[in-house]
């Protein structure tokens, strides 16, 4: 299965609403546009990989922050509290288990239980 990432991102208009682009071996490749702040949360059983396709964002942890630039990725281990923050629009590709809830242990107005495909 071949996927044109730029074409997929052109169909995404909302921030903080991940879409499924592909699935493999119980994992999902998700695409999301970020802008502004998310919420501190953690995932009890899942690690998350965030790859910056366009732009950059800051991953805030309780004890430090990391800037992730275009072409870079960061892996957030399960159980680690984190909060993505994007001052400008940022396109990210997420690779994580299909069971991963976008807000982890927090349920709020940004929680999306059923993801759409793009």
Q: Each predicted region: which residue ranges?
A:
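A cytosolic small-molecule/anion-sensing beta-strand core signal
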Residues: 25, 53-54, 69-70, 88
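Short, conserved beta-strand element in jelly-roll/cupin
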Residues: 33-34, 43-60
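Histidine-centered active-site/metal-ligand motif
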Residues: 41-43, 82
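Short, charged beta-strand/loop "edge" motif centered at a coil->beta-strand transition
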Residues: 20, 37-40
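Short, charged/polar surface micro-motifs in flexible loops or helix N-caps
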Residues: 26-28, 35-37, 54-58, 65, ...
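Ligand-binding loop in jelly-roll beta-barrel domains
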Residues: 78-107
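A short, N-terminal "cap"/entry segment at the start of jelly-roll beta-barrel domains
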Residues: 1-30, 107-118
